[in-house]
């Protein structure tokens, strides 16, 4: 909709070019002032329309987050400088992108709260934004909710997250880093996503749900729709 008029509002890739939303990996430019103006204007329009359509029971949670299947947000010089502020030292995917997105979302949350104090802005911690920003660099507004995604490609869902000596322990720490930053966290989990594995996640489910509950996670959404998994009905019941 906006690329022809405002290409500067779209993410710059490592090749220095900006691409529109028809490109699967295209994002927005998070530091461009016009980007923010357009997003805030659209958000206010959605909220106002919903209040008119459903005055007695309007939606309260609005999602703003990155596009799927992207390895970075924006690599323009201004965004790179912001990324460096929040980076834990291992690249943009180690807190830098999360900080870049969270700063943008925090601003949205503050501005929308002035008119609609009951509205919550939800944003993903996923792919390049899955790791929390460097401690002490940013806070989370009270009307911002983090939706942390436990990527099935980065953990073993047949083993509990908190398993000493297992690579899942690093995933558990990533979640704990977010919970140290805010208690307004939801989970998008897969439990056991692939259809081809002769494995069962039953033992892991109970311990993982216990971990999430003890961490004061607000809600859990489980994506595990392949019906030819072993013990599919039991897994679904437990989830």
Give the residues covered by each predicted segment.
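Catalytic-core regions of glycoside hydrolase
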Residues: 1-33, 37, 41-239
